[in-house]
Amino acid sequence: NFIGMGYYGTYTPYVILRNILENPGWYTSYTPYQPEVAQGRLEMLLNFQQMIVDFTGMDIANASLLDEGTAAAEAVGLSHRLNKSDSNLVFVSENCHPQTIDVIQTRAEPMGLKVLVGNEDKALDNLKEDIVCGILQYPGTLGDIKDPSEAISKIHKRNGKAILACDLLALA
């Protein structure tokens, strides 16, 4: 059962719980100075990137961001820099997590981007202009599983980059 908002009933092994989830070094700005710890962290990040490439089929992946909202906002910024048109419109599915939408809206304003939050089925059909990008959530914030292929095609028809915020276990 996907209860939504990014929280799903999964079993977390104790060793992962204790050494990663409960270790403040992973979710604060703390930078380890011991070379052995730094090397271990680099190896873990490389393995994470490889797992993302394997799950998604993408050519490259990044592992330097700590939360989904920041990663989505960075993807919007990258899409904006790659954008060939004069568009400044970013589409965000209303099915994205609220915290992700908030971070995107906050980061888009200083870049001069307008954010349209809406239903991907209706809003993308009604758009008449190009967009910088479109952001979709998988599974959705209410826990629903939906094939994003049609929405991705609509985003591409508007010359936008498709960005997906995914739960890794849903891709496995």
Predicted regions and their residues:
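N-terminal entrance/gating region of PLP-dependent enzymes' catalytic architecture
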Residues: 1-47, 53
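Short, well-ordered beta-to-alpha junction loops that form the rim of enzyme active sites
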Residues: 7, 65, 95
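Extended, polar/acidic
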Residues: 1-13, 56, 98-103, 110-111, ...
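Short, hydrophobic/aromatic alpha-helical segments in well-folded domains
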Residues: 48-51, 61, 75, 103
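Short loop-beta-helix segment that forms the pyridoxal 5′-phosphate
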Residues: 33-37, 54-73
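Conserved PLP-enzyme active-site core in the AAT-like
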Residues: 70-172
